[in-house]
Amino acid sequence: THTTEEHMPLYHDDSADGFCERDHIASNFQNCAIYSPANKTLMRIHFKPATHHSTKVVMLLDGASAVDTHNRWVNLGGAARTFAGKNINVILPIGGGASFYTNFEYPYRGCSLTHPTLNMQQWETFLTKDVVRWAQQQKLSTRQWRIGGFSMGGGSALALAERHQNIFAKAFSFSGLNTIALPGVQEMLTTTSDITACMWAPFGTPVNPSRYEF
């Protein structure tokens, strides 16, 4: 089935190496490489442009087992089918498995046995600064975005919306891990992936406000 979006011009990135190409999973999406100064590398998103020049944006976050090749909303979550022909811009960040889309406080070296040579991930900065900058280049709104996700992405969507109310107006979570302060959650995260030890400082006491923040 042909869609309006697959015939629309490819978008761009003003950085030296950024680009968009036709998405090989969903023809109505583009696969865009955006340079992230915070992460010092190109990072990928799926992007579906609005069909009639709307500047509104919705962002959907993947779960803890997110892969580096695609965001599972685009195929398994039905985003390609659901948003086909719709007058809204859709951004699906690619990657970020077990990251909670947060800014890591520690480099992997010394805190992760399975990823000892990787640098600190800066997902929150990528989503709220680098992607927003890219959206502004495309003449999209940088306010009143909608953000949602499932599992890990659901809790992360709520946390990002709360901290960046200048960007996100609405947030939704499907089967999300919406708090990290419950007893046993830190241990559960560590058994999921040892990179969680690189994310945050120890949770601290219950009266420490930072205990309740992603």
Spans of model-derived segments:
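Non-catalytic cap/lid and distal C-terminal segments of serine-dependent acyl enzymes
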Residues: T1-F214
